[in-house]
Curated annotation (Swiss-Prot):
Interacts with CtaB. Its main location: membrane. Catalyzes the conversion of heme O to heme A by two successive hydroxylations of the methyl group at C8. The first hydroxylation forms heme I, the second hydroxylation results in an unstable dihydroxymethyl group, which spontaneously dehydrates, resulting in the formyl group of heme A. Pathway: Porphyrin-containing compound metabolism; heme A biosynthesis; heme A from heme O: step 1/1. Pfam families: COX15-CtaA. This is Heme A synthase. It is a multi-pass membrane protein. The gene is ctaA. The keyword Transmembrane helix applies. It comes from Rickettsia bellii (strain RML369-C).
C-alpha cells in the first residue's frame, strides 16, 4: 500500500505543477479576468451553446477590462481567454479532489498514521486558502483599473508552491533511500546552504510573480545591464521606498539581484556537496548544476525576447525543478 501512497503523492505533485504552469500561461495571455464570477461548484462545466457563450461574453463586457483593453474583441477571441482561465480553475478543483478523496481512504485504512495526519490537513487547508486567494486576486482586477494586484498574484503563486513543497517533501521521504554516510563526516554546511537555497528560491518565485504582475519583463530587455547601467537611473536616487514595489523597473532590478544571489548560494551548495565525495550527493550536485543553468538561461531568454510564452513558462517550470532538487538534497541530508 505504500506504493499506492507514493503514486498518489506523485500525482498530486504533477497536478500542482500543472496548475502553476497553466496559471502562468493564464497571466501571460491576460486571460485571468475573463471569468468574472466565482462558482466553486456550479462552475465546473464550460458554456456549450451559442447562447450561453454570449451570456458569458456579456458578463465580461460589463467589466472595465473589456472597454479598457479588449474593446472590439470577437466571441472567438473571448473563448480563447475564457477557456484558459476555465482550465486553470478546473485543474484547481481536480487537484483538490485528487488530494482529498485518497487522503480520506489512506487515513481510514491506517496507511497514513495519526502522527502524520496533521501535516496532510495543513495541505488541505492550504488548498482551501489557495482557492479563496485565486478569487481574491481576480476580484482586484474587476475594478476601474483592470489589472490584478501583483501582490495578490504573488501570494497566490507562493501558496501553490508551498503546497507543492510539502507534498514533494513527503514524496521524497516516502520513496528515497536514506543517505548512508559515516557519522564523522560533517554535513552541516550542505544543510545550511540547502536551507538558504530553498529560502532564496521562494524569494525569487515571489519576485518573479511581481515582475509578471507588473509586466516588468517588457522593459529593459537587455542583459546584464539595464540601459547601460547596473543600477537603472530611475531608482538611483530613491532606492528605499515602499512605493518602489509598484515600479516595474525596481521590481525587475531586485529580481535580477535575486538571481545573482541564488546562483551564488546554489553554487556554494554544489561545491559543499562535491566535497563530501558521496555518489548520491554527487548526483544531486549534477542535477543542481543543470537545473540552475537552465533556469538562468530561460530567464535571460525570456527577458531578451520580450517574454515569449514558451520561454517564460519554461522559466517558471524550472524554478519548480530547481526547488525540487534542493528539497531532495535537504531531505537526503536531514534524514541521513
Amino acid at each position: 500500500m505504500q506504493k499506492n501512497l507514493t503514486r498518489w503523492l506523485l500525482t498530486c505533485c504533477i497536478m500542482v505543477v500543472a496548475m502553476i504552469i497553466v496559471g502562468g500561461i493564464t497571466r501571460l495571455t491576460d486571460s485571468g479576468l475573463s471569468i468574472v464570477e466565482w462558482r466553486p461548484v456550479t462552475g465546473i462545466l464550460p458554456p456549450f451553446s451559442y447562447d450561453t457563450w454570449q451570456a458569458e461574453f456579456a458578463k465580461y463586457k460589463a467589466f472595465p477590462e473589456y472597454n479598457a483593453v479588449n474593446y472590439g474583441m470577437t466571441l472567438s477571441e473571448f473563448k480563447f481567454i475564457y477557456l484558459l482561465e476555465f482550465v486553470h480553475r478546473l485543474l484547481g478543483r481536480a487537484t483538490g479532489l485528487i488530494y482529498i478523496l485518497p487522503l480520506i481512504y489512506f487515513y481510514f485504512k491506517g496507511i497514513i498514521k495519526n502522527r502524520d495526519i496533521l501535516s496532510y490537513i495543513i495541505v488541505l487547508l492550504l488548498f482551501c486558502v489557495q482557492g479563496f486567494m485565486g478569487w481574491y486576486m481576480v476580484k482586484s482586477g474587476l475594478v476601474n483599473h483592470p489589472s490584478v494586484s501583483h501582490f495578490r498574484l504573488a501570494f497566490h503563486l507562493i501558496i501553490a508552491v508551498i503546497i507543492y513543497h510539502l507534498l514533494f517533501y513527503k514524496l521524497v521521504k516516502n520513496c528515497c533511500d536514506i543517505l548512508l554516510i559515516p557519522s564523522q563526516i560533517n554535513l552541516k554546511l550542505p544543510l545550511i546552504f540547502s536551507v538558504a537555497a530553498i529560502a532564496m528560491i521562494y524569494v525569487q518565485i515571489f519576485l518573479g510573480a511581481l515582475v509578471a504582475g507588473l509586466d516588468a519583463g517588457l522593459i529593459y530587455n537587455s542583459f546584464p545591464l539595464m540601459g547601460g547601467n547596473f543600477i537603472p537611473i530611475e531608482i538611483k536616487d530613491n532606492f528605499i521606498s515602499f512605493k518602489n514595489w509598484y515600479d516595474p523597473v525596481f521590481v525587475q532590478f531586485i529580481h535580477r539581484l535575486g538571481a545573482y544571489s541564488l546562483s551564488i548560494i546554489v553554487i556554494a551548495l554544489i561545491i559543499s556537496l562535491l566535497k563530501v565525495k558521496n555518489p548520491k550527493l554527487n548526483k544531486v550536485a549534477f542535477y543542481l548544476s543543470i537545473a540552475l543553468l537552465i533556469q538562468l538561461s530561460t530567464g535571460v531568454i525570456t527577458l531578451l525576447y520580450h517574454v515569449p510564452i514558451i520561454a517564460a513558462s519554461m522559466h517558471q517550470f524550472f524554478a519548480i525543478v530547481l526547488l525540487s532538487v534542493v528539497i531532495w538534497c535537504y531531505s537526503l541530508i536531514k534524514n541521513s
